[in-house]
């Protein structure tokens, strides 16, 4: 949703007459983009979660395909979430081959399921890559691709005066529990335990949870229940960037946010937690 909104914003500035239809979240909604349904309705964490909701996901895929064909766009622009977007793109292409398909954020074929590349070229006309090393995987299968870089690297992190934002008399530690509700429910308790341990050793820290607007209340409620005082929860993107740049280190969920932390030159600890079934499945599939 965030990546798509940045692309759409630039397109709107160049051509305000383009019409859009999406499966998006709050960022696209803020740009006035109509959504078939909210992105949260297809956001599931782990293999087992997807398996338990497979019929709901299939229904959403079919609804999305139906609405795309009805909308009859010139371009189907899909972003990340390959297990959803690739299925949609594949079926749309079969129904109407005139619709050009562009996918942004290539599937991580260098990590697992490398053979996906052979299938992708049947329905994706152009792949936009975040990382330069990805090119060889798609060049090998003659899939048209362009290295466009990662938008997070474009964002400059500027150290600034944080007065009135958080407790600036303490050392700042940024915490990133993820954007999915399922991730937050698992990782926030772990991060709160981490804070308790850190406070026993040294209370001279200010811990800041980086949240989305949608998930802020959930994190705030967890923080209140913990009764830990030296914690702030922020959702404003401009403030988050400033606080991250002023942090002594960060603890973050594995994923895109780890690149953001790295680009800010902030040392980090990467965390994640899978249940045992998801762990064993992923261990079997990884390259």
Regions found by a protein language model. Name each.
Residues 25-27, 182-246:
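Donor-nucleotide binding loops and adjacent catalytic segments primarily
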Residues 27, 236-285:
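A donor-sugar binding/catalytic signature common to diverse glycosyltransferases
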Residues 1-165, 174-184, 188, 197, ...:
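Active-site and donor-binding regions of nucleotide-sugar-utilizing enzymes
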Residues 168-174, 205-206:
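Charged active-site motifs of nucleotide-sugar-dependent glycosyltransferases
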Residues 91, 141, 222, 264, ...:
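Residue-level signal for well-ordered alpha-helical positions
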